[in-house]
Amino acid sequence: MAAGAAACPEAEELEADFENTENNNNTNRIFMKKGTVIAIAVVALIAIWSVAAYNGLVSKEENVKKAWSQVENQYQRRSDLIPNLVATVKGYASHESQTLQEVTEARASATRITVDTDNLTPEAMLAYQDAQGQVGAALGRLLMIQESYPELKANQNFLELQTQLEGTENRISVERKRFNEEAQIYNTSLRRFPQNIIAGITGFVPKPYFESNDGSDQAPTVEF
């Protein structure tokens, strides 16, 4: 009996140790489960944030592309006016051949320069802006011819074309400004943390701006 009684405390101690071990294991499993849940939640949040940041950059870049399309549309509108304008001036000032040729050649050169909105580099922007500037300067010289030709100045078709040209120049200015605004919004997003990380990984690059000018690339307004 004494031996059996002595064994009981040892058995109870072993049982207590076993229970403590089980409790510790259960606690560890709970912590592991919590840690796993937290890790999954963190990964999910990062994934959601990454997708949102990427989609935001895509949206802003699309706005830049849309703004660029409007710029091109207005420059194309101006280009479409040139043949009729040249033909009208030629009817009254045919010997102004050099000026007429300059306008025609500037238009042809500008038409050959296209810009890929997916690769809108500063070099491409500069080449495009320079070509359009040459057109504007040539048109300015062409319009000044009317001062020497009263009949041309009074021609109704010429007056209508000049009105359309002036309206187009105004729209060009508006769309250029809008493009710069959209490009600035996009470029600012690229520099901000943490979008700059997503931009670096996914290949988003800054967009160039239209440079401000003194109006030398625009056809002047001539008072009648």
For the regions a protein language model found, what residue spans apply to each?
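A helix-centric hydrophobic-segment signal that preferentially recognizes long
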Residues: 17-22, 26-224
